[in-house]
Amino acid sequence: MKHGSLFSGIGGFDLAAEWMGWENIFHCEFEEYKQQKLKENFQKSDSYGDIRNFDSRKYKYKIDIISGGFPCQDVSIAQQSKKLGGAQGINGERTGLWKEYARVIREIEPGIIVFENSPMLLIRGFERVLCDLHKLGFDVEWRCFFASDFGYPHFRKRLYGVAYSRFKRWKDIAKSGGILSKVLPKRTPRQIPISIPLERFNSQSSYDNVRMDDGFSKELDKTVIHGFGNAVIPEIPYQIFKAIEQYETNRHTQAAQAGRTARAIP
């Protein structure tokens, strides 16, 4: 599989693709620190900055899967208390960059898109995402996952969506039961007590405890923490990618069986 990521952060989707043995073709990230980490960790990938300046037409028909979590600031709960009119939703300056995500999809025409965002997107502009993807020829499924569902010691509820082309080899995914229904294990780790001692991360006193050993400024430390705080948990896209690849394996198996059956008919 050939994979490209948008709004790549520090590379959660890219790492999951690497775990799968897929080829990371490109990543696209605006923030300098995150872009630096991407270049360090995925040196064979093409690297791009501001998505608004990303001309993706060179990748047309060359990418199987595009992934990424477009900005959620304008739909998140945190925006409700701000003085700028509250959450602006899909029309906001940051979350509104979805239109660039859609543009890249239109230019590249991949088979599958995997995206991530705040669950609040469901009531603050998700219909725009669905409408745009439908116009581009994709069917969409979506589901909210908790980090704790995958054994992590925090909840962090996030929305994940998988869109697949109605005109390519993935067009029958819906008939097979979809992708996201196959992601979670039967037993949910969220219900299992976690034996990791956790302290409440609180205010300045706690912040001082996570300063770097090399003596860099707190502002740089803050950038590092921000990078990890906004990152997707790689295990979640990894499980989604595994379900996608399993569909591919099943499709090839069924095609081979059908071929053998056809040859056996006198």
Q: What positions do the PLM features span?
A:
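Conserved active-site and SAM-binding loop architecture
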Residues: 1-266
